């Protein structure tokens, strides 16, 4: 029996297992060594965050994220699309880096993502939707235009509606479905079913919106066959424009679309097959996944 195994069962099995003095001392030493190693690792992790905040860069952006956090990659996609200079610090949750006092000063919720804008007096922003709106609004102000956003207040409101739908309905429901499927302390089938059904409802909303955009696109571009499509004698799937990309707002990809990418990329883990169940969502996601900035961001570049 290894020392680690002995220690892990020590308190529960002490009355039934006869441990000699030498074995007891070895167990205690092993336990102490493990505690010291954990403390040293924790100090190293904390010092990494402390050192960063003590010597912040003078320009660019710093994104605080996590390797398994879709919302962090969501912000990385927008930074990459806008070609903004940024560095990502992937926090180590196992050692509590998200609870480091310096990090909590910029995100009182102690979660990722959070962003520091070193161009703007180290301004910090937290919550993915707020970060995205900050980035595109600032980009529009500084450059006069922003393809991912709009200078039209009506279009801005439409983009914002989808962005808030993603942050309040899409991401949390997938997150809960993942939690109850894989991480909850005991099986709760009703919770898995409830959240998975809600994810499907959310995708139904997006599917309908994209299908309406596709129909409008085909009717606008495929003029010679428009009457047949309207009469129902020729299905829209016969149009040469059936696989053209369509977007939630306007004729281009915006943050309304791109904010969905990282979560769409993991939804198969809760048993939802986008290609089969939501073909428009699948095509839409496929178009976005091919964008060079999206590829770079999802790689963690």
UniProtKB/Swiss-Prot annotation:
Domain of life: Eukaryota
Domain named GST C-terminal: residues: 152-301
Keywords (A to Z) from UniProt: Nitrate assimilation
GO terms for cellular component: cytoplasm
Claim: Cytoplasm is one of the keywords in the record: no
One biological process term in Gene Ontology: regulation of nitrogen utilization
Name of one Pfam family that matches: GST_N
Molecular functions (GO terms): glutathione peroxidase activity; phosphoprotein binding; transcription corepressor activity
Residues of the signal peptide: none
Domain GST N-terminal: 59-143
Function: Plays an important role in the cellular response to the nitrogen source. URE2 gene plays a major part in the repression of GLN1 and GDH2 genes by glutamine, and is required for the inactivation of glutamine synthetase. URE2 gene product may catalytically inactivate GLN3 in response to an increase in the intracellular concentration of glutamine.
Family the UniProt entry places it in: Belongs to the GST superfamily.
Quaternary structure and partners: Homodimer.
Entry protein name: Protein URE2
């Amino acid at each position: 029996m290894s020392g680690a195994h002995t220690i892990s069962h020590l308190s529960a099995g002490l009355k039934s297992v006869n441990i000699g003095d030498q074995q007891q001392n070895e167990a205690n030493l092993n336990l102490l060594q493990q505690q010291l190693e954990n403390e040293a690792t924790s100090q190293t992790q904390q010092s990494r965050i402390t050192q960063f905040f003590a010597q912040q860069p003078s320009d660019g952006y710093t994104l605080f994220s996590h390797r398994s956090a879709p919302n962090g990659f969501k912000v990385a996609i927008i930074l990459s699309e806008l070609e903004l200079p940024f560095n990502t610090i992937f926090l180590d949750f196992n050692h509590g880096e998200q609870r480091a006092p310096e990090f909590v000063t910029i995100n009182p919720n102690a979660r990722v993502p959070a962003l520091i804008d070193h161009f703007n007096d180290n301004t910090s922003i937290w919550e993915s939707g707020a970060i995205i709106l900050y980035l595109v609004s600032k980009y529009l102000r500084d450059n006069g235009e922003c393809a991912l956003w709009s200078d039209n207040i009506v279009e801005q409101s439409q983009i914002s509606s989808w962005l808030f739908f993603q942050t309040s309905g899409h991401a949390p429901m997938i997150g809960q479905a993942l939690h109850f499927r894989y991480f909850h302390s005991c099986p709760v089938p009703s919770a898995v079913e409830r959240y998975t059904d809600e994810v499907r409802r959310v995708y139904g909303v997006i599917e309908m919106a994209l299908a309406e955009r596709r129909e409008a696109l085909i009717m606008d571009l495929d003029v010679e066959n428009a009457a047949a499509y309207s009469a129902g004698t020729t299905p829209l799937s016969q149009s040469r424009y059936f696989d053209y990309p369509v977007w939630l707002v306007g004729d281009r990809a915006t943050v309304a679309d791109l904010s969905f990418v990282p979560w769409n990329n993991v939804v198969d883990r809760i048993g939802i097959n986008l290609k089969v169940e939501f073909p428009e969502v699948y095509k839409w996601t496929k178009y976005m996944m091919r964008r060079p900035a999206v590829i770079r961001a999802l790689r963690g570049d």
